[in-house]
């Protein structure tokens, strides 16, 4: 049997509501040895965990070198943006106008497509997984609607975790890297 002992550091960050609009954040850091360790971050009942087996330093040093995007991808399944399905009908209308101006649609095709969008308010999922209605099939690219630049909106969970990581990064910064 092999027994290894490590030191665990727990940090509680309070009074950050004014500067970062966050509730208290707790951070638990465990460095297993050179280049291996884990971190657990909790805030308002949610927690995020990351483990790295070969990061070339301590967790504290590693956090200074990597981006929030990398950390969020490793610690949570959040994307920077998410589909804005509320804007799908407006997007289709703008696409009808654009293709009409470009001469790809004649007046009657554009009018029929516009009426269809007004009457049925189709969303991207119904067009991805269903049969494309004849009124919208005249739009160039509608045979493969997943390639359209559908509208997205910022993912609030991603932004929230990014703000937390900014605070954690500043607090766990090694002493020689801290700003005075």
For the regions a language model picked out, list residue spans one by one.
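An exposed acidic His-Trp-rich patch
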Residues: 62-116
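Hydrophobic, Leu/Ile/Phe/Ala-enriched alpha-helical segments that form helix-helix packing faces
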Residues: 1-2, 15, 63, 75, ...
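Aromatic- and glycine-enriched beta-alpha-beta binding-site module
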Residues: 32-77
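Residues in flexible loops and secondary-structure boundaries
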Residues: 19-21, 49, 79, 83
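A eukaryote-biased signal for long
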Residues: 102-180
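Short N-terminal edge-element motif at the start of the domain
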Residues: 1-46
């Amino acid at each position: 049997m092999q027994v290894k002992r490590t030191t665990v550091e727990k940090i509680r960050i309070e009074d950050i509501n004014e500067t970062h609009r966050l509730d208290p954040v707790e951070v638990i850091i465990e460095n297993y040895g050179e280049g291996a360790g884990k971190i657990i971050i909790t805030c308002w009942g949610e927690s995020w965990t990351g483990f790295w087996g070969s990061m070339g330093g301590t967790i504290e040093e590693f956090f200074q070198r990597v981006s929030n995007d990398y950390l969020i991808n490793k610690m949570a399944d959040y994307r920077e943006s998410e589909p804005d399905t509320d804007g799908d009908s407006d997007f289709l209308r703008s696409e009808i106008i654009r293709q009409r101006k470009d001469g790809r649609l004649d007046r009657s095709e554009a009018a029929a497509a516009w009426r269809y969008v007004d009457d049925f308010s189709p969303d991207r999922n119904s067009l991805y997984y269903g049969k494309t209605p004849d009124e919208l099939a005249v739009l160039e690219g509608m045979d493969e609607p997943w390639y359209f630049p559908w509208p997205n909106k910022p993912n609030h969970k991603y932004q929230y975790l990014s703000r937390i990581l900014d605070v954690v990064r500043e607090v766990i910064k090694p002493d020689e890297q801290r700003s005075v």
